[in-house]
């Protein structure tokens, strides 16, 4: 019978292999973008010239998109706009794979609920995803505090370079994941089953904050719940 630790190692191996594939995807995509920019820059062009993306150009040409040639060359630069969009999209996809698939697989392997599985590195990636999805890729003035990543993101437009992408995947392959499980005690599990939907949400939201869980901070609503449950049991 495979031990829990072995099961987790197998799952992590699958995750690492999948993430490595995304590194290759990023490498080939950004390399191609950069080479296309160099090719365009070597061709004679004017400030007003446009470049088109078309299909079946020899027999039945169809034009699908256009942009100024000079703008395209600029956006094709190494760590330029096009490459930045690729790296951001891949990071969002990688987080989704962790959150929707691999975290659940690990939880099943160790016999707990996925919400009790924590990974500091993926917590850092979640912050990046939040900026991309909910803040239009704009880093707030206060910046971002990471637990594992050593990135110093300036406020303003979020830019994820090729080198940063590699650093992230190196952390995945190294000791950066630091996966841990924080299942509630049997007593707390019993109490959770007696909470109202509103109480449970308040409890779970409170302990979603890493410092509260790590420092074993008491949930402010605990005494009120204990009192309510006690009164119900006496009645």
Tell where the protein language model's regions lie, with residue ranges.
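Charged/polar positions within long, soluble alpha-helices
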Residues: 102-107, 130-141, 177
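A short mid-domain helix/strand-loop element embedded in enzyme catalytic domains
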Residues: 62-71, 95-107
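Short, hydrophobic, well-ordered secondary-structure elements
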Residues: 83-103, 122, 126, 130-133
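Extended intrinsically disordered or low-complexity regions, especially N/C-terminal cytosolic tails and loops
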Residues: 1-85, 116-120, 127, 143-235
């Amino acid at each position: 019978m495979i031990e829990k630790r072995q099961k987790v190692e197998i799952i992590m191996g699958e995750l690492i292999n999948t993430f490595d594939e995304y590194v290759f995807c990023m490498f080939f995509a950004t390399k191609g973008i950069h080479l296309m920019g160099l090719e365009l820059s070597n061709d004679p062009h004017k400030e007003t010239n446009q470049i088109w993306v078309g299909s079946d150009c020899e027999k039945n040409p169809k034009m699908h998109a256009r942009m100024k040639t000079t703008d395209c060359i600029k956006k094709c630069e190494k760590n330029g706009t096009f490459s930045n969009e690729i790296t951001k999209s891949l990071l969002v996809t990688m987080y989704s794979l962790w959150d929707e698939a691999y975290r659940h697989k690990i939880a099943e392997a160790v016999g707990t609920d996925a919400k009790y599985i924590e990974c500091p590195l993926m917590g850092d990636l979640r912050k990046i995803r939040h900026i991309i999805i909910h803040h239009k890729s704009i880093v707030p003035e206060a910046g971002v505090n990471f637990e594992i990543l050593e990135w110093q993101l300036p406020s303003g437009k979020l830019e994820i370079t090729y080198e940063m992408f590699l650093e992230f995947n190196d952390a995945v392959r190294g000791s950066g994941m630091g996966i841990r499980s924080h299942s509630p005690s049997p007593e707390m599990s019993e109490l959770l089953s007696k909470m109202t939907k509103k109480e449970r949400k308040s409890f779970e939201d409170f302990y979603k904050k890493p410092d509260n869980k790590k420092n074993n901070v008491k949930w402010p609503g605990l005494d009120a719940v204990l009192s309510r449950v006690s009164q119900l049991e006496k009645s």
